[in-house]
Amino acid sequence: MSSSAIQVAKTATYLPDLVEVQRASFKWFLDEGLIEELDSFSPITDYTGKLELHFVGNEYRLKRPRHDVEEAKRRDATFASQMYVTCRLVNKETGEIKEQEVFIGELPLMTERGTFIINGAERVIVNQIVRSPGVYFKDEQDKNGRRTYNASVIPNRGAWLKFETDKNDLLHVRVDKTRKINAHVLMRAMGLSDNDVIDKLRHPEYYKKSIEAANEEGISSEDQALLELYKKLRPGEPPSVSGGQQLLQTRFFDPKRYDLGRVGRYKINKKLRLTIPDTVRTLTHEDVLSTLDYLINLELDVGGASLDDIDHLGNRRVRSVGELLQNQVRVGLNRLERIIKERMTVGETDSLTPAQLVNPKPLVAAVKEFFGSSQLSQFMDQTNPLAELTHKRRISALGPGGLTRERAGFAVRDIHPSHYGRLCPIETPEGPNAGLINSLATHARVNQYGFIETPFWKVENGRLIKEGDPIYLSADLEDECRVAPGDVATDADGQILAELIPVRYRQDFEKVPPEQVDYVQLSPVQVISVATSLIPFLEHDDANRALMGSNMQRQAVPLLRPERPLVGTGLETQVARDSGMVPISRVNGMVTFVDATAIIVRDEDGVDHTHYLQKYQRSNQDTCLNQRPIVCQGDAVIVGQVLADGSACEGGEIALGQNVLVAYMPWEGYNYEDAILVSERLVKDDLYTSVHIEKYEIEARQTKLGPEEITREIPNVAEESLGNLDEMGIIRIGAFVESGDILVGKVTPKGESDQPPEEKLLRAIFGEKARDVRDNSLRVPSTERGRVVDVRIYTREQGDELPPGANMVARVYVAQRRKIQVGDKMAGRHGNKGIISRILPREDMPFLPDGTPVDIVLNPLGVPSRMNVGQVFECLMGWAAANLDCRVKVVPFDEMYGAEKSQQTVEAYLKEAAKQPGKEWVYNPDNPGKLQLIDGRSGEPFDQPVTVGYAQILKLVHLVDDKIHARSTGPYSLVTQQPLGGKAQQGGQRLGEMEVWALEAYGAAYTLQELLTVKSDDMQGRNEALNAIVKGKPIPRPGTPESFKVLMRELQSLGLDIAVYTDEGKEVDLMQDVNPRRSTPSRPTYESLGVADYDED
């Protein structure tokens, strides 16, 4: 296959850096966020005012991290740096100043790839989308159907303030959802006179009713207003004027307690047309009066006042890593401040130093808690490079300060017109999180206020101006402009050709002449996310299936020999490169050395730059991370050139699947209901073989009876089983292991109680005994096998940090090659997924006129009802490309080149392919895109021509090997005594309500009885049954299921008198000790149950 790819459509396909949203935010935190927090807490004074502690925020410094990234992963450590800050302790009485550099905690650092290493695991901090602080005007209908209006002032932190109108034209205010207070009471309490308020309002006549109402309640002075305010906000406490004054001051005018944030101030200024500087982060009298004025204008419907849409992206902002971390640091500093104040009061004033006052623990704990257990700090999805990249660009509405799944309604989840070019309308999970977790669109970026912006080209007098950088607009700015889509047709000069252009204006569509267009979108791809933009012919797919296609590409397992798609979209290179999976040259220069582990590039000044490659490392999802060089010694390279392929990459492009020959036809029912029929070639040629690396870990702990030991001497184990263990009892690297094999031998001391009487007798006679130990080795779990690729041992002597109580930890990595097999899940890029139902020999597969057998047979009925026709276009375009020996890049949304363009392009390529010598059969004009296939079993041609072509098919991470599971005996749940569920718990198969109905319908009474008793939760019965099976005796009669006893107990605990009786009215005690039954001979199950049996028992 030639490496040159033909670009079918010419548009801007180069994207901005895709991980910028993470990196820029963390950089902001280091440059500004941290300093801002330290400064806001400085100075801390003690209760007497004698001592002051100043943090010199802009003089903080970070030490070099103790371990580099690789070392941190290996040692299970955190990749973090120590923070030091200069502190000044000022004694006001003596004027003495002590200055010292103090350690204030560890700060995890971001790696180049935008991730964090926490305890050896790579984690990502997901961006959160929350309601922006500011002022919001809403309308509500009361129960009589009358509209009332309200205004909420929402700060970044602090109390909410809500103004409301009611049916009597009075204005009220609520603080933090407490009881209503007359709005004028608040004005008076703030020290505003009636005239102050009236002068500021454009329609004061509406407000006068509220003044009269306040006077009628007898609140005419500031003091009375403050008392009233205190009564309403703190009911049940004795009110006082000073209390009211302090309450008002701390709630709204104290920067420590109330903060609008830079964003809140910007939004309020913009909405109310104020000019308050953005350093004033608390409420001002002007804010409150302007809000009232705007609310009255809304009520009277004058002055251009408008309601707010809270789902508009102009009213929602993104909090990225930097800001989330800053909030967490604030929490830590708050705790620290309390500690410092206490220490100032307790300690000797003269001998105190800053180092004695500052305790790093609270800050360390806050940061650790955020990275370790916050909802937004997630274990990185590393299945393949695309999964990793998407995870870093994810935007979640959940998390602290956000929404919860249960409370989120339809409006929040829905696609909003302002999402255009900012959030992807397609990529979101299926299920309860749909619409709450989104993905950033390809060209979107987050501005300094946290609003998402998207780029446009300017249009002047109908001419597109593409000089310089594009202009980025946020959602509220864009609403005021007329924006044309990115696929408008222009001439070479940039003049727009059509007479009327569809534009978006104020969230609506209209058609205008080119002269009225303000901006044009940068590229047709800018609407969708990275994963979605990898789907070719996306415009021909139904949105639901495109959603599945986007999500399933993230689950594709990296294959042994990746192959880039025949039909791509032109973004594959950038996705591979920005995911951080491929090493990139840092300089212009020449490759001087290449081997499997490193590449050395010598720059123009003769300096060597070494790039180390990852070899067979385990990813978070147990897939294999491996890099292979693609440059040779002596090659010239430029900055930013890809030097090696990572997992699921080929030639620097992302390659998630394989291009295989697909036919759409039914085959003996083997592809019924989305099942897939595949050829043996995929197994034999290792097309879909992937490497998975599993980690097994064991620790030797200190027990009460002495330490556990990792050793080769394991009791009651044959010498053959120890063949692959070294003298320490640890498996050698390169050994092939199967389920049940010992990986690490470990023995645990046995207590006296564990010993049978004969052991005790022997010990009494001979004194020292055969070692009292129990085999506790690490073995390969059932259904697993593979080759040991790495063994790591951690001990205290080597300086490794171990969990408490552990003396030594051993880790074994086992790699396995998994070929494709029946039960594995495969999918295309268009949401067409299925399970492999049969693997046919090559000779039985349908074959083409030139004798080539097809690789995969899909069901044609999967296309029409699902409306993902893109797969057919891809398949035919791939067929043409394979026959022309080239690769094609198709940019989505190609109607700008004319109607039905996809169809024409594909047909043109097919005709071109058929012109090749000996390839006339490739295109049949009577049945375009279809070929006559021949049945491999009979050699007869099929009745109808069949659609055949090359499509990229992925193997997904849902592998049957990880799911298959069986149980003979195993653990039971404590309360119900029923078997546990799931593979991890060695669980059973649930026999649910409907399965019971099915057996009842058949009348299979004995089968049903066994399933509900001895095979499940009849404790005594199942022990007896096992005993009977082992001894070859008939199985005894089942007893009472434990769950029935639990039900009885529950009903009794409700106070109901409920019991079980024989048909003679004699009560049966279900809870009595069940031992007497043991003495009776075990009866066959089929014996009829007589009354006499009870008397025997």
Curated annotation (Swiss-Prot):
It catalyses: RNA(n) + a ribonucleoside 5'-triphosphate = RNA(n+1) + diphosphate. One of its GO terms (biological process) is DNA-templated transcription. This is DNA-directed RNA polymerase subunit beta. The keyword Transcription applies. It comes from Prochlorococcus marinus (strain MIT 9313). The lineage of its organism: Bacteria, Bacillati, Cyanobacteriota, Cyanophyceae, Synechococcales. CDD domains: RNA_pol_B_RPB2 (cd00653). Residues 1072-1097 are annotated as: Disordered. DNA-dependent RNA polymerase catalyzes the transcription of DNA into RNA using the four ribonucleoside triphosphates as substrates. In cyanobacteria the RNAP catalytic core is composed of 2 alpha, 1 beta, 1 beta', 1 gamma and 1 omega subunit. When a sigma factor is associated with the core the holoenzyme is formed, which can initiate transcription.
